[in-house]
């Protein structure tokens, strides 16, 4: 028989930097999960990633106080800012453009994000990422 699920916890944690302090500790503690066990498992799973890159994670908590977790890909906005070399997006994206991205850069980001996107193919994924880039005040070359 399958374990009884008591809840899901969604967090964004920097790669390799999970520790028992907030937000991880309180979120797991109120469900009675072993905080240090999660931190060690998460840090081991993100060892090969760029340190500090925010990784969305969905933790499934079970009634017997065990858990599983699924890591998602980093947010598109973080990847776009990194590709454009920016600290933050535009405060007024319609009039104030803060950077420029090529189609090749968008394709690379789309390939990274592909497992989490619902796009049918790479071209649709590129258009989705291009829309996110435009809403951040980035000019997009080669995408209609």
From Swiss-Prot:
Quick one: a GO cellular component term? cytosolic large ribosomal subunit
Instruction: Write out the entry's keywords from A to Z.
Output: Methylation, Ribonucleoprotein, Ribosomal protein, RNA-binding, rRNA-binding
Post-translationally, this protein is described as follows, namely:
One or more lysine residues are methylated.
Q: Per its UniProt record, what InterPro entries does this chain match?
A: Ribosomal_uL11, Ribosomal_uL11_bac-typ, Ribosomal_uL11_C, Ribosomal_uL11_C_sf, Ribosomal_uL11_CS, Ribosomal_uL11_N, Ribosomal_uL11_N_sf
Q: Which SUPFAM superfamilies match?
A: Ribosomal L11/L12e N-terminal domain, Ribosomal protein L11, C-terminal domain
Biological process, per Gene Ontology = translation
Which Pfam family, any one, appears in the UniProt record?
Ribosomal_L11
Q: GO molecular function: any one?
A: large ribosomal subunit rRNA binding
Q: What does this protein do?
A: Forms part of the ribosomal stalk which helps the ribosome interact with GTP-bound translation factors.
Q: Which PANTHER family does this chain map to?
A: 60S RIBOSOMAL PROTEIN L12, LARGE RIBOSOMAL SUBUNIT PROTEIN UL11M
Subunit details for this protein? Part of the ribosomal stalk of the 50S ribosomal subunit. Interacts with L10 and the large rRNA to form the base of the stalk. L10 forms an elongated spine to which L12 dimers bind in a sequential fashion forming a multimeric L10(L12)X complex.
User: What is the protein name given in its UniProt record?
Assistant: Large ribosomal subunit protein uL11
- Origin species, per record, is Neisseria meningitidis serogroup C / serotype 2a (strain ATCC 700532 / DSM 15464 / FAM18)
Taxonomic lineage is: Bacteria, Pseudomonadati, Pseudomonadota, Betaproteobacteria, Neisseriales
């Amino acid at each position: 028989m399958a374990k009884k699920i008591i809840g899901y916890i969604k967090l964004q944690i920097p790669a390799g930097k999970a520790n028992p302090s907030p937000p991880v500790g309180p979120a797991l503690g109120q469900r009675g999960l072993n905080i240090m066990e999660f931190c060690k498992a998460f840090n081991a799973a993100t060892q090969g990633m760029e340190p500090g890159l925010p990784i969305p994670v969905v933790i499934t908590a079970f009634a017997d106080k065990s858990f599983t977790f699924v890591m998602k890909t980093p947010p598109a906005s973080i990847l776009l800012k990194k590709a454009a070399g920016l600290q933050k997006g535009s405060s007024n994206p319609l009039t104030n453009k803060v950077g420029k991205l090529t189609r090749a850069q968008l394709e690379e980001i789309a390939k990274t994000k592909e497992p989490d996107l619902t796009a049918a193919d790479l071209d649709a994924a590129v258009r989705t990422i291009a829309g996110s880039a435009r809403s951040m005040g980035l000019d997009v070359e080669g995408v209609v």
